[in-house]
Amino acid sequence: SEGEDVTGIDSVNDYYDVNVKYGRLERTGISQENITYSQRVQSRIHDNYKFVKLNLEDKDGIDMLFRAEKFDAVCNLAAQAGVRYSLTNPDVYINSNITGFLNILEACRHNETKNLVYASSSSVYGNNEEYPFSIHHNVDHPVSLYAASKKSNELMAHCYSHLFKIPTTGLRFFTVYGPWGRPDMAL
């Protein structure tokens, strides 16, 4: 509404029903039949919105997109979510949440992105018994690989902010819910 151009990126993986993901995209004016990997698709509803199907682990694809778009700011909400799934599929979490996040940080660094906001997780609090949770609580003992990957994101972002002067803000989300939320989450 403020005239900003927005580019959405998603791998549209099958962690849960892809029809839910395509349904969300349809509401933004992006039709499934128009989506091709790494190609920008213009919304038919919003002049300032386009979508790219892209894996964050695809360093070349991320680099090309950042060079082409010259993003002023990045809001990275992408990650392989789910604590239970991380127990049986650890490589997926390392690839998406660590390597993918590194690719975003590097693209921000080399393309002079002015601000990065990213999703961390309440899972970083682990077995902390102090309530309410606080950013001042110790989060050095994750109890799942998912939590460890999100804590790693926080440490990586801190380093890039310090070393390369990229302003970063991490958001420790709790369960996101609603009619378009993940079907494996409780309401």
For the regions a protein language model found, what residue spans apply to each?
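Substrate-binding strand-loop-helix patch
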Residues: P179-L187
